[in-house]
Amino acid sequence: MDDRCYPVIFPDERNFRPFTSDSLAAIEKRIAIQKEKKKSKDQTGEVPQPRPQLDLKASRKLPKLYGDIPRELIGKPLEDLDPFYRNHKTFMVLNRKRTIYRFSAKHALFIFGPFNSIRSLAIRVSVHSLFSMFIIGTVIINCVFMATGPAKNSNSNNTDIAECVFTGIYIFEALIKILARGFILDEFSFLRDPWNWLDSIVIGIAIVSYIPGITIKLLPLRTFRVFRALKAISVVSRLKVIVGALLRSVKKLVNVIILTFFCLSIFALVGQQLFMGSLNLKCISRDCKNISNPEAYDHCFEKKENSPEFKMCGIWMGNSACSIQYECKHTKINPDYNYTNFDNFGWSFLAMFRLMTQDSWEKLYQQTLRTTGLYSVFFFIVVIFLGSFYLINLTLAVVTMAYEEQNKNVAAEIEAKEKMFQEAQQLLKEEKEALVAMGIDRSSLTSLETSYFTPKKRKLFGNKKRKSFFLRESGKDQPPGSDSDEDCQKKPQLLEQTKRLSQNLSLDHFDEHGDPLQRQRALSAVSILTITMKEQEKSQEPCLPCGENLASKYLVWNCCPQWLCVKKVLRTVMTDPFTELAITICIIINTVFLAMEHHKMEASFEKMLNIGNLVFTSIFIAEMCLKIIALDPYHYFRRGWNIFDSIVALLSFADVMNCVLQKRSWPFLRSFRVLRVFKLAKSWPTLNTLIKIIGNSVGALGSLTVVLVIVIFIFSVVGMQLFGRSFNSQKSPKLCNPTGPTVSCLRHWHMGDFWHSFLVVFRILCGEWIENMWECMQEANASSSLCVIVFILITVIGKLVVLNLFIALLLNSFSNEERNGNLEGEARKTKVQLALDRFRRAFCFVRHTLEHFCHKWCRKQNLPQQKEVAGGCAAQSKDIIPLVMEMKRGSETQEELGILTSVPKTLGVRHDWTWLAPLAEEEDDVEFSGEDNAQRITQPEPEQQAYELHQENKKPTSQRVQSVEIDMFSEDEPHLTIQDPRKKSDVTSILSECSTIDLQDGFGWLPEMVPKKQPERCLPKGFGCCFPCCSVDKRKPPWVIWWNLRKTCYQIVKHSWFESFIIFVILLSSGALIFEDVHLENQPKIQELLNCTDIIFTHIFILEMVLKWVAFGFGKYFTSAWCCLDFIIVIVSVTTLINLMELKSFRTLRALRPLRALSQFEGMKVVVNALIGAIPAILNVLLVCLIFWLVFCILGVYFFSGKFGKCINGTDSVINYTIITNKSQCESGNFSWINQKVNFDNVGNAYLALLQVATFKGWMDIIYAAVDSTEKEQQPEFESNSLGYIYFVVFIIFGSFFTLNLFIGVIIDNFNQQQKKLGGQDIFMTEEQKKYYNAMKKLGSKKPQKPIPRPLNKCQGLVFDIVTSQIFDIIIISLIILNMISMMAESYNQPKAMKSILDHLNWVFVVIFTLECLIKIFALRQYYFTNGWNLFDCVVVLLSIVSTMISTLENQEHIPFPPTLFRIVRLARIGRILRLVRAARGIRTLLFALMMSLPSLFNIGLLLFLIMFIYAILGMNWFSKVNPESGIDDIFNFKTFASSMLCLFQISTSAGWDSLLSPMLRSKESCNSSSENCHLPGIATSYFVSYIIISFLIVVNMYIAVILENFNTATEESEDPLGEDDFDIFYEVWEKFDPEATQFIKYSALSDFADALPEPLRVAKPNKYQFLVMDLPMVSEDRLHCMDILFAFTARVLGGSDGLDSMKAMMEEKFMEANPLKKLYEPIVTTTKRKEEERGAAIIQKAFRKYMMKVTKGDQGDQNDLENGPHSPLQTLCNGDLSSFGVAKGKVHCD
């Protein structure tokens, strides 16, 4: 039998054969035979070997098709069932759970053979399930010991004894495995499994730490013990899959990491050169001189108000930097314990990494701007937008793409399983028929087919349309490709076995004379298969059959007919949509009641809320009881929502009973009330979707969550073990010096115990790592470098990889639920929607009745105006003519009328309507009486038929007359209006600027008949009916003048100059707003000028509006959204001109004036349109987030309201709770009791607090206040309420991670949907054709360039050869890297010797690069300046020379610009390294994605700037007089436009918005109402919250969406077989073979040229026969054109595809247009024909030589015979018969 075929498998015990010495001998024999076959020459064409079977993979469970394992063979060596291992020295072992283990049959450790008793015992132990459970239990207990054991006592005896025990267990486990498997040499040995490497390292380190007399520190070594937690991953195979996916994503991240590191290095160098030594500028007292020890001279430094921090200053600020008695000087102190600075490359790099991760970057931003000047903001803009937004989101893009690739594999796998399912179904059907024919009982198979292979059960294999990384199959979560134990029981594996079994049980096996035993085994096989299928089916059922019977017996109440009647009535009522609507209204009102709770409620109000709670609880309990009665408990509890409702109702009932009986409420029970809010999800699809996403993600992300928990656990324990002793809750004296009872030296964030260490790691995952790292470094002393390593590792591994995969999965979950929700929404509506539909239908009925009455009245009013002519003729006039006429009419008549004769038959109109078209229509739809106006004349009956449009298959209705009116005076296209006398409301304006509605596509020809560019009607159609005075005839005086005026206005407003002028005025008026800052009051002349310009601008806008009214008409003007926006802004501008006190507040709204730019600038218009398309979805998600957050708000109010107060003294320090315990003591002791500005006193405040927590800004103060809170109006105590941490952790996971990422999901999803609507140009091409098309598109734009000619001068030629060589480039790039390293070595206050060395090095580099420039100019001559890179190099060299000269000047004060700018010039040299990018394909893809994104990002940037501009103007109007406090100071404020923009740029990333809001949230008590400093907290909150939502959540997420989209596009392009660079390199090689750029090379040079090309275009030698296949066309002189060669080589790389010839012809035509040179040369032969000619010539030559040899040897007579004989070689050739020589027949001339 062929080795590749599967053996016949019958499910009985004979499958399991013990592994004996005979088995080993048989394997050795097979291996020897295989080796012989390999040596044999006959077997060189190797037969493909079988692959390992997935269902028999190690660690999977053995499929039940193989039968039960004999008890005596459990744990014993068996012959391998997988044919793949037939020729491998291996055996398999099965345990009781049928798990497969494989071992090598060679000697373990060179001693123990496969039959050794010690090894057999080790094998039995290692495969036993109890052994695995014991090891997992040990790992868990060990983790608990590590987590609970405090770091302070890590060397205690108890801990050491426990560690010895655990180490002993791990050593025992390793020894057992080594004895069973061998160590490393053989297959399946111990160290061949990478997971065992981890065990070895942990054990090795543990042993080393116990060696006596060892001198190294034990603590870092023992910290490695924590990695034992990873053993859980090695035991649970599902976790291995997730870790594998993570590792794959890390592989893909390599390019991003390299690019990020490179960019960070560049930014760090620029920052170092710009800001070196600037952050140590402080205000020092003029009395203090020579401060050597800053700590001793603390009094010499000026401090910030109410802060212990030193005041920073900048020399650029002059005298205003410090107070009068202080001056600005350099010191030895940098901010944040000296860790924030740019003094050397290391600290600068750390600062840039902090900027990129956006952790407290606003502090660095404020410090740098204060010390170096406001121009530094441009540096931060570049780093934030390029470094932070782009590079960080590239990480997300790469992880998302890696995940989507996995998705595609999953989809393919599911599709394959589905196909296999169908095949198995068919095979089993055939098998059943075959077995029945042989007399096997049909009943054994009937159940299999009927119970299992049904369409319903097919769903168990997963829905292939649903692409999810984790398959949600029947409520069970299973990752694809999983190696888990449960996976092998899934049906796909069964089906694989089924298929194989069916093949083995084919009819051939069961002939009449077959073995009866074989027939019995076949029956056994099918029966076991049936049983297995049934077991699988039962495993999917919700409960056992006995449970189902009991439930149907006792939980379905059908007592008596009367009871059934009651049930029927109740079911009708309870399932009615109105009942559901009533319950939903109750839920909403109940939610409002819950949200109304607040601090300091009045007794009556509280009583009302309690009564309300009782009422709603009663309603919900009654609903539950009635539904249970109506539906029976059996059916009621089968729905998830009903179970949820019943739980909430019963908990509420328990809470009420507890209050009634015990007169007090339990917080635990009361908090469950808020779950009622989630009942809204039943009737609100979006909320339902969100809950589904969270549910699916929590389930589907189970494995990932476990991995994340393990990672957090490991880092928490590592932090606790390494830093727990020093970095604990008590601050060290150098950080805190308690001078009194008000100063606390306790810290909330530390690593002193596991819980707090976990919180620190969680905080790092939230994005805040730098502050804890500073404190850790300060406390750890010698281990400070370890702090940096650990904290950055947590940031990179945790935040950038794991959380990004989490987000990627969540986004995919969102898009899937969104699509599924849309499909379900189309299919069925919720009951609330059905109830609302009833109301809508009732309202529509009332409205239509009223409209009908109005139209009836209108028609009565208009009837006298219509005159009828006797004779029963139809209406006919010179103004109204029939649209459809008989074909028999002459063409002249038709031309006169100007109407086409034919109308498409597709018009969907009733046959009894008459369609009329007026030639010239009035400005409204009223028809005028009189001879000259429209008259209705009745046509004779026969002719009337010609005017009617007939439509088949329509039932005739009552006679109606309709007319189609074409507005001949519309602006662009005609208005086609159907007038139905019965239904005037159906008048439809078909074509307008705002909307286009095609009436049955048949009127596509109408616009061609209509004059263009004319105004539309002034008033809406139908207006003249109600107001006859507005009816005008524009053909009669004086309305002709009005019509001409309108046409003139129309031409004006449509003129490009008018639009340009308006844009100019908008820009000027917006610019004027900039000057209205806080200093305007002191500048009356500027104020007067601004008032004048404001009046002028307002009048210009009014004039523009009036012109547009006249030109467009009111109908068109007010139906355009952009025009409405302009109108609102003009009205606001007009109100500002009126000097009324009441209207003064409207002046602020002038800030909206720049919005007019939106309608004028196309780039922003595109972005806004995309944004408007997403607004409904964004608002929906925003509303869902608000509801979701409401639950946490209500809980927050319940837990923390009134508890955020504290007692402070005169210096704003909190007094210790042991001195003052409550508010009354505080006030009696003449202290101040203040409440924190952001608190949980009511739901509104709670929303603000949660927004700060969700954006991680200002959240520390809120968490501190919460965890320190005791009771209402009690003094806070340090961490008295530690459970408060849990509240915030849960909110961050569900309220921040889930809900805020939904914004990204919504925007990306909408963005993709709009892309699909706009795209689709490639939908008619196959994938192969797309590839070919892309390649052709790239090469079509290329053509050969003429290379730079080598100089004739020998010296110049030598230099030319040097500078054009690759080695020269490598040397120069190496020097650039060395120059970069030398710049990195610079530092602030470096030793003079070091400074001298670096200066000299700089001179050396300047000289080298100058020489390089001169040498290249000498060698390349004028061609040097034709290359962009050369020009860049030249400019850099010139600037370097200038900067180096200026830096040598002693007196640099007179230079008009800062000398630091010249330092930056040197950095431009680094830009030359970008040449290397060409070699790095992955990085090139990333940069290409950036280049593709730039246009879109520029538009988004413009929109963001516009939003910032408007908010800056609003901020200047509202907050210009806020006193300096918290984040508001002399630089960052809203006093001027520049300072406002600085603040808004900062908070566009949500950074520090809490500190800017804080000064504006003054309480009424601390605010003087007469002061201008008082502001409404509501306005300030709305201002900042709206800006955060618009900029941070929407615009910045659009930025992310663009990057993701373009990264995907760039990746697709980079994955194309041929890229731009391949074509560039082709032409570079071409230049060497075609120096004159003729576009042709000789055929003889083709072989060398093809071999010289790099892959994939290269055709390696020998390649002549491959050219034959290509059939290349040649022109005269045996030349080939470059395009022909490139086409042929491209087709060879891409392979064959349909339609390539037509595409090639199209691309060649384009190339011809671009390169007319090829037209001059027509091909005369091809390479194939030329080769045939060459072979023919060679044969002739050979024959001729043969003939000549015979001539010389033979005599003359023989020679005559040869010449004249009929079969002479020469004669044969002359006859043209070359077939005997292997050449195609052709004519050979012998003349």
Curated annotation (Swiss-Prot):
**CDD domains on file:** Na_channel_gate
Location comes to: Cell membrane
Kindly give the InterPro entries that the UniProt entry links to this protein: Ion_trans_dom (IPR005821), Na_channel_asu (IPR001696), Na_chnl_inactivation_gate (IPR044564), Na_trans_assoc_dom (IPR010526), VGCC_Ca_Na (IPR043203), Volt_channel_dom_sf (IPR027359)
Q: Which residues lie within the membrane without crossing it?
A: 345-369, 754-774, 1244-1265, 1537-1559
Q: Which residues lie on this side of the membrane: Extracellular?
A: 149-156, 213-219, 270-344, 370-376, 597-607, 660-667, 726-753, 775-785, 1075-1088, 1139, 1203-1243, 1266-1281, 1386-1396, 1451-1461, 1523-1536, 1560-1579
Transmembrane domains' residue ranges: 127-148, 157-180, 193-212, 220-239, 256-269, 377-402, 573-596, 608-631, 640-659, 668-687, 703-725, 786-811, 1052-1074, 1089-1114, 1121-1138, 1140-1161, 1181-1202, 1282-1308, 1362-1385, 1397-1420, 1427-1450, 1462-1484, 1500-1522, 1580-1604
> Carbohydrate attachment sites?
N290, N338, N781, N1209, N1216, N1222, N1230, N1568
* Cytoplasmic-facing ranges: 1-126, 181-192, 240-255, 403-572, 632-639, 688-702, 812-1051, 1115-1120, 1162-1180, 1309-1361, 1421-1426, 1485-1499, 1605-1791
| Complex formation | The voltage-resistant sodium channel consists of an ion conducting pore forming alpha-subunit regulated by one or more auxiliary subunits SCN1B, SCN2B and SCN3B.
Report the outcome of L1158P: In FEPS3; increased voltage-gated sodium channel activity; slows deactivation; depolarizes resting membrane potential; enhances spontaneous firing; decreases rates of current decay; does not change fast-inactivation; does not change slow-inactivation
The tissues in which it is expressed are:
Expressed in the dorsal root ganglia and trigeminal ganglia, olfactory bulb, hippocampus, cerebellar cortex, spinal cord, spleen, small intestine and placenta.
Give GO terms: molecular function aspect only: voltage-gated sodium channel activity
The UniProt entry's GO CC annotations, sorted and at most eight, read:
axon; axonal growth cone; C-fiber; extracellular exosome; neuronal cell body; plasma membrane; voltage-gated sodium channel complex
Disulfide cross-links: C283-C322, C776-C787
The record describes the protein's role as: Sodium channel mediating the voltage-dependent sodium ion permeability of excitable membranes. Assuming opened or closed conformations in response to the voltage difference across the membrane, the protein forms a sodium-selective channel through which sodium ions may pass in accordance with their electrochemical gradient. Involved in membrane depolarization during action potential in nociceptors which function as key relay stations for the electrical transmission of pain signals from the periphery to the central nervous system. Also involved in rapid BDNF-evoked neuronal depolarization.
Name this polypeptide is given:
Sodium channel protein type 11 subunit alpha
